[in-house]
Amino acid sequence: MDNKEKLMERPINGVALRKVTTFSQKTEASNFAQRVLVNPFERNKILRMYHDAKRILEAKMPCPLMAVVYPSYVCNHNCQGCSCQELDIKENVFLDPQNFAKLLNSLRYLKIKSIEFSGGGEPTLHPKFGELAERAANEEFELGLLTNGSLLSDRLADQVVDHFTFIRVNIDASDMQIYNKMHCPPEKYGFQVVMNNLEEVISKKNKKNSKLTVGAKVLVCQSNMNFIESVINLAKDIGCDYIQFKPMRNAKDSLLPEQVGEVDGLIRALQEKYYPFLVCGGAKSSKSNRKCWLSPIHLVVDPLGDIYPCCHYQFRRESTRMGNLFDQPIEKIWFGERHKEVIRNLRVEDCNLYDCRWHYYNEVMWQIIEEDKMHLNFI
């Protein structure tokens, strides 16, 4: 037998069948799995929600899998197109720590398994953020964090490494000049501070042999479109596990229509060039022709305790607010008529103002369930 081949035996009905698989074939299959399946952005993991999606189409409300929690409505950066600017909330900007226990109890009642801390504002600006995260972790919630990274040092870095499943830091640029143009941060929360903090988190992760996934995020715009490869190199050299690109929307610096295709093509080419380092996303915006109906697979809670169907509520707060979990039992909010009314009143033209993964989720699950395009009764 050629030394490039390996014999694999597979018993069927007591008979050993000999199958020859070349190392090159195994490597190709392994590479495919790593490239296509084994990453946090594999969009087809929505298929695990098949039975819940069927319940929604049957006018039944499932329990959500994940909660997005906003600990803060304030931020120490001033980024273009940020929802924090649009909301412009001045009072009760932090989640009350005394209400956090009630929040966790409500999530547990709904059998929620994971919490993503994001914003809103910058979640780590909450004076008790580390304590809130530790409490949630001790109550066996899986945790994720979306952050600008400006406060990820010392004890908070340890808490993230010890208790979180993933963290994604919005870096946006590979040098201080472009970063400052996009983020407008105070000097003490600027580019070099963020990079130092990111390096500290990764160093602690490696020393502790933590399974934490550390990612970098880039909003692609006119200011950074010529520096795509350099920001990939930055994330890779620091030790990030991946970098994700998304288009900046609804801002003066958003890509012009004639720029989108070229930049998206560049990102696709760099995905191949830098493999196996994971380069995700692109520069094209998502749109949907179908009204959003899958929002109940998650919920969003703001610092006031108000519950919304998704994170893109900043310009339609009144029409999408479902209730307040600090004032009402969560079961009356989640399974109540107001929740159903909010879903009925969602408009696709509003949803298309933002780049949203639910565009894909809604379409795929509709085709699978209503149109049976996957022929699920066949393997």
Model-inferred region functions:
Residues 2-10, 15-19, 63-68, 248-252, ...:
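Accessory C-terminal segments flanking Radical SAM cores
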Residues 77, 176-177, 308, 328:
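Glycine-centered loop/turn positions within well-structured domains
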Residues 7-166, 192, 255-266, 363, ...:
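Conserved alpha-helical substructure of the radical SAM core
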Residues 66, 110-118, 137-144, 165-171, ...:
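Conserved C-terminal portion of the radical SAM core fold
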Residues 82, 175, 310:
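Short, basic/glycine-rich phosphate-binding loops at helix/coil junctions
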Residues 123-124, 149-154, 169-188, 223, ...:
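Conserved radical SAM core fold
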Residues 85, 182-185, 313, 336:
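Residue-level signal for well-ordered alpha-helical positions
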